[in-house]
Amino acid sequence: MSRIGKEPITIPSGVETKIDGQLVEVKGPKGTLNVNVPEPISVAVEDGKIVVTRPDDHRTNRSLHGLSRSLVNNLVVGVTEGYTIKMEIFGVGYRVALKGKDLEFSLGYSHPVLIEASEGITFAVDGNTKLSVSGIDKQKVGQVAAVIRRLRKDDPYKGKGIRYEGEQIRRKVGKTGK
């Protein structure tokens, strides 16, 4: 059995789970999320725990088993705790500001770059070089953070750009003149 898939997911207090065929819906203090579990995988609630099972040991079913369990676990964690990704901006003149719910970046381009907050995503700015992306959906939070990082990827020669907090950038040595 899948080591990830066979672990049951404990349902914390204040969280409601509704299973309708392949659709799993989780309601908690921070909101409601749902996911469609792939077809051969079945999900059930037993003794206050969510159990994900597969019909047989076929290769695709084994891989979908762990995936489905992780997706359902992400829902439970999202509606109880939420997800936050912290980011840092490095570079002279590079800064970020909060404009209403949206972010405005100055990244050395001839124009400011505006990132709109999609539904369920909130931004927080600390100073003008640190920001955090928060929400209950792990996939949405990660996608928005990746879009922000792609605005100005880290430069390995000068170390300028946007990076995740704690991310180490391998620095390269530039050309040496004669």
Curated annotation (Swiss-Prot):
Belongs to the universal ribosomal protein uL6 family. Keywords: Ribonucleoprotein, Ribosomal protein, RNA-binding, rRNA-binding. This protein binds to the 23S rRNA, and is important in its secondary structure. It is located near the subunit interface in the base of the L7/L12 stalk, and near the tRNA binding site of the peptidyltransferase center. Coiled coil: none annotated. Signal peptide: none annotated. InterPro entries: Ribosomal_uL6-like, Ribosomal_uL6-like_a/b-dom_sf, Ribosomal_uL6_a/b-dom, Ribosomal_uL6_bac-type. It comes from Corynebacterium glutamicum (strain ATCC 13032 / DSM 20300 / JCM 1318 / BCRC 11384 / CCUG 27702 / LMG 3730 / NBRC 12168 / NCIMB 10025 / NRRL B-2784 / 534). NCBIfam families: L6_bact (TIGR03654). GO terms for cellular component: cytosolic large ribosomal subunit. This is Large ribosomal subunit protein uL6. The keyword Acetylation does not apply. The keyword Iron does not apply. One of its GO terms (molecular function) is structural constituent of ribosome. The lineage of its organism: Bacteria, Bacillati, Actinomycetota, Actinomycetes, Mycobacteriales.
